[in-house]
Amino acid sequence: MQACTLIARAKINLYLEILGSRPDGYSEVAMILQSITLADRVHLQRRPHGILLICDHPEVPADARNLAYRAAELLQRECRAELGVEIQLEKQIPVAAGLAGGSADAAAVLVGLNQLWGLGLTVGELQSLAARLGSDIPFCVQGGTQLATGRGEVLQPLADWEGIPLLLAKPRHLGVSTAWAYQAFRAHRAASLPSAGASLPTLPQVLAALERRDLLALARSLRNDLEQPVLAEHAIVGKLRQALLEAGALGSLMSGSGPTVFGIMASLERAAQARDSLCHHFPEVDFWVTQFAPTGILLEPDPQALRLP
């Protein structure tokens, strides 16, 4: 195999609870992570040596600041791979949006180079390497629906719930740093009363809703502890959450560190209708109709391989 193309899917957080601080500087979390069909395309081409990264998005770096580039470097170093690669990223997942776009691209590079370079690594071995690059990348390697604990790298797969319709909304010119969001949460928690989180949904509630396939219960069980500090700084996030609910969403939540907000919709048709209506009211916001997906990374079939003699 000389080249391959992978679909790298975004994720949303159906649940994000911050349990405390860790000695390594990260936060101890409990999260439900869900792959969605919004995705980047990652093209990999073997080279004799070196790493070349090309991206069609002006805000995405094409050097070692990029997680996809660092994923290739890590595999070269750890597996003593002497080959190189050209990485081309076709971005559809917005940048700094709380959707793990950079993490998904890095996961695609790990999965793709494992095939392209013939490394023979297992999914578990790829996830162990991924954890050294970022907390979301181990999830993105496999995707689907998973419970994530630790700093997000300890994963427990849950039963997939494919095809649940979503409407995503992201302010076009707003990005939120994950590090800033966690710092803001700590400051917000320090200033809050001890009982402030008493009425929030709990992990057993969202797990039970997923197990029963109860969409209304799931919509009522959404939780993101990073949401309040981000809302305090960026009022548009709260306005979008409310707008999604008024447009028919069964439940709405900010994903990850934001600022993207998603609404769980009753159908793809309702999601498209809501998108068309909200576009007129929020011209500076980008909207996507998407849905739950059962996997994180897909290897596109080689068109040449599918051609009959």
From Swiss-Prot:
Q: Name one Pfam family in it.
A: GHMP_kinases_C
One Gene Ontology BP term is:
isopentenyl diphosphate biosynthetic process, methylerythritol 4-phosphate pathway
Supply the alphabetized keyword list.
ATP-binding, Isoprene biosynthesis, Kinase, Nucleotide-binding, Transferase
Pathway note = Isoprenoid biosynthesis; isopentenyl diphosphate biosynthesis via DXP pathway; isopentenyl diphosphate from 1-deoxy-D-xylulose 5-phosphate: step 3/6
InterPro entries on file: GHMP_kinase_C_dom, GHMP_kinase_C_sf, GHMP_kinase_N_dom, IspE, Ribosomal_Su5_D2-typ_SF, Ribsml_uS5_D2-typ_fold_subgr
Reactions accelerated catalytically: 4-CDP-2-C-methyl-D-erythritol + ATP = 4-CDP-2-C-methyl-D-erythritol 2-phosphate + ADP + H(+)
Judged by the first EC level, this protein's enzyme class is: transferase
* Binding annotation for ATP: 94-104
| EC number(s) stated in the UniProt entry for this protein | 2.7.1.148
Superkingdom to which the source organism belongs: Bacteria
Q: Where is the active site?
A: 11, 136
Function field: Catalyzes the phosphorylation of the position 2 hydroxy group of 4-diphosphocytidyl-2C-methyl-D-erythritol.
Family to which this protein belongs: Belongs to the GHMP kinase family. IspE subfamily.
PANTHER family in the record:
4-DIPHOSPHOCYTIDYL-2-C-METHYL-D-ERYTHRITOL KINASE, CHLOROPLASTIC
Q: What is this protein called?
A: 4-diphosphocytidyl-2-C-methyl-D-erythritol kinase
